[in-house]
Structures are given as structure tokens and as C-alpha cells.
């Protein structure tokens, strides 16, 4: 996701190596000064720690946010934490979930000084099942099937799709991500797809029940992305890796070619 460049910070860094920074900055034109003053005006206290619409007039008391409007989350000291699209007044539909997975314009903006433990201390809350007993076919039209050698999966061309693994896709939500995290549970079981390191086979992890909250077990979570007709599953625990297939190889985690990372979801 693209980050919004901090133009004022870049300007300061550029001048920081010059002893004449203080005097030079005073010679900026009034137009330049007014630009920065307008762009970095202090945030009013009544806007701290609140969602604010970028498109709705702040003086309107009757305006309401729709699903497609942009909102921003800011901290008490005015730092922008996140820009995302969401609804504050309607139930999220399947079309909305598809829009989140397919939206390449949304951005996450986090403070540069945010500590790692702060960014990783995220809770993912169960939302609902969005696909039941679906099949995953890769770009070569191979279906994912169970591998009898262990808790693994592989891809094969099937004449009978009843032999393919059926998955239930469960959606989760958190306050820290604008993408759509999901789990892939083998239908009619409590076995969940679990991401491993690069080039290592994904595993089945048995859970006593479908987790209502996921905090430490992020290997079970994948950001579902949709580009055109193809679907991608990016690991939350390993954000550069995707579920992938490859000829004569178990289903594994990979960053891209020569492994195949694009899939087509086939409904029951």
C-alpha cells in the first residue's frame, strides 16, 4: 500500500545538513509559507481520537458517512494513524467485503515512531463466515487436495471436483488493518490452514473451535486480496508471503513466481 509522503518533513531533512537552514527557511515565499501553515494547522481538541470524514463538511450536523467515504483516525496529538473506508451506519454485505478485498486505493498511515510491540499487538475479532465449502483452483486450473503424507496439501488437476478440499472462509476484523483478514478452515472440521516460512509447506492446525478472537495465532490469518477475477491470500504473520502452488510440490508459502500465488474461488 502506498504511503502518503510527508513533504514538510522531507523539506526539513533537506535543510538539516545546511548551516544556513534557519535563515534560508525565512526566505520562503509567503505562498509557500501559507501552504505549509494550511497543511499542518493544529488539530482542534474536539477532533482528537475521533473518526473524521474527508469528504463531509465538518459544520454539517446531519451528514452521515456512507461505505465509500474516506475517514481518518487521529491520535490525541494529531498524528494520522489510518485512512480507510468503512461504514458507520450499515451492515457490511458480501459486496462490501468483496470491495475491501478488491480495493487497491486504501492506505494505512502509521506514526514513524510507533513501537513494534504497539503495531503487533492487534486483536482480530470474528465477524462471520463469508464462503462455505468453496474450492480453490490455481492459475493452472489445479485444485487443492489433501496430501496423505501428513498435515499437508498439494495441487492436482481433477476430473471430479468432489475430491478437492472444501474450505470455509471466515472473515475477521480489527482496528489496525484496512485489508480483510480471513481464515481458511477445511469444511466440516476444525482444521485451519496455517502459514509457515517461505518455501515451507502450509500445515493444518486443529483448533478446539473457530476462534472468536485471534491475537497470537496470526499464522491462521490471511489478507484476502482480489485483483480482477483472481484471489490472493497474503499471510498476516509473514506479510510478504502468499499461499502458493508449484508443480510436484506441496502447497507452500512464496513471494511470487515461479510459484503460483493466484487462485480462483469456486463456489459450491
From Swiss-Prot:
**Position of the signal peptide:** none
Query: Cellular location of this protein?
Result: Nucleus; Cytoplasm; Secreted
Please state what the protein is called. Answer: Interleukin-1 alpha
Molecular function (GO) terms for this protein are: copper ion binding; cytokine activity; interleukin-1 receptor binding
Task: Give the propeptide positions.
Answer: 1-112
Under Pfam families, the record lists: IL1, IL1_propep
Q: Does the keyword Heme apply?
A: no
Residues of this chain annotated as glycosylated in UniProt: 102, 141
For the keyword Coiled coil, the answer is no
Q: Which GO terms describe its biological process?
A: cellular response to heat; cellular response to lipopolysaccharide; cytokine-mediated signaling pathway; fever generation; immune response; positive regulation of cell division; positive regulation of gene expression; positive regulation of immature T cell proliferation in thymus
The protein's role, per its UniProt record = Cytokine constitutively present intracellularly in nearly all resting non-hematopoietic cells that plays an important role in inflammation and bridges the innate and adaptive immune systems. After binding to its receptor IL1R1 together with its accessory protein IL1RAP, forms the high affinity interleukin-1 receptor complex. Signaling involves the recruitment of adapter molecules such as MYD88, IRAK1 or IRAK4. In turn, mediates the activation of NF-kappa-B and the three MAPK pathways p38, p42/p44 and JNK pathways.
Q: Which residues carry this modification: Phosphoserine?
A: 87
- Which superkingdom, per the lineage? Eukaryota
Q: Which UniProt keywords apply?
A: Acetylation, Cytokine, Cytoplasm, Glycoprotein, Inflammatory response, Mitogen, Nucleus, Phosphoprotein, Pyrogen, Secreted
Q: Where are the annotated segments for Nuclear localization signal (NLS)? A: 82-86
What does the comment on domains in this protein's record state? The similarity among the IL-1 precursors suggests that the amino ends of these proteins serve some as yet undefined function.
Post-translational modification, as annotated: Acetylated within its nuclear localization sequence, which impacts subcellular localization.
N6-acetyllysine modification sites are: 82
What family is reported? Belongs to the IL-1 family.
**UniProt source species:** Ovis aries
Q: Which PROSITE patterns does the UniProt entry name for this protein?
A: INTERLEUKIN_1
One Gene Ontology CC term in the entry: nucleus
Principal cellular location given in the protein's record: nucleus
Quaternary structure, from the entry = Monomer. Interacts with TMED10; the interaction mediates the translocation from the cytoplasm into the ERGIC (endoplasmic reticulum-Golgi intermediate compartment) and thereby secretion. Interacts with IL1R1. Interacts with S100A13; this interaction is the first step in the export of IL1A, followed by direct translocation of this complex across the plasma membrane.
Amino acid at each position: 500500500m502506498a504511503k502518503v509522503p510527508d513533504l514538510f518533513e522531507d523539506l526539513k531533512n533537506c535543510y538539516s545538513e545546511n548551516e544556513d537552514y534557519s535563515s534560508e527557511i525565512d526566505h520562503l515565499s509567503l505562498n509557500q509559507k501559507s501552504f505549509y501553515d494550511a497543511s499542518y494547522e493544529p488539530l482542534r481538541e474536539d477532533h482528537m481520537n475521533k473518526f473524521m470524514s474527508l469528504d463531509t463538511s465538518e459544520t454539517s450536523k446531519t451528514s452521515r458517512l456512507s461505505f465509500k467515504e474516506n475517514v481518518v483516525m487521529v491520535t490525541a496529538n494529531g498524528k494520522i494513524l489510518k485512512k480507510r473506508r468503512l461504514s458507520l451506519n450499515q451492515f457490511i454485505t458480501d459486496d462490501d467485503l468483496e470491495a475491501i478485498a478488491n480495493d487497491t486505493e486504501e492506505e494505512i498511515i502509521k506514526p514513524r515512531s510507533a513501537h513494534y510491540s504497539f503495531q503487533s499487538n492487534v486483536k482480530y475479532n470474528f465477524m462471520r463466515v463469508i464462503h462455505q465449502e468453496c474450492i480453490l483452483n490455481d492459475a493452472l486450473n489445479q485444485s487443492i487436495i489433501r496430501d496423505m503424507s501428513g498435515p499437508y496439501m498439494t495441487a492436482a488437476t481433477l476430473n471430479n471436483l468432489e475430491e478437492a478440499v472444501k474450505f470455509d472462509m471466515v472473515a475477521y476484523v480489527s482496528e489496525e488493518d484496512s485489508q480483510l483478514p480471513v481464515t481458511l478452515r477445511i469444511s466440516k472440521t476444525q482444521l485451519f490452514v496455517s502459514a509457515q516460512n517461505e518455501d515451507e509447506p502450509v500445515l493444518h492446525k486443529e483448533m478446539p473451535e473457530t476462534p472468536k478472537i485471534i491475537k497470537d495465532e496470526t499464522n491462521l490469518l490471511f489478507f484476502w486480496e482480489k485483483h480482477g477475477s483472481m484471489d490472493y491470500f497474503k499471510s498476516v504473520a509473514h506479510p510478504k508471503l502468499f499461499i502458493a502452488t508449484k508443480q510436484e510440490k506441496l502447497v507452500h508459502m512464496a513471494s511470487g513466481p515461479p510459484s503460483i500465488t493466484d487462485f480462483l474461488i469456486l463456489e459450491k
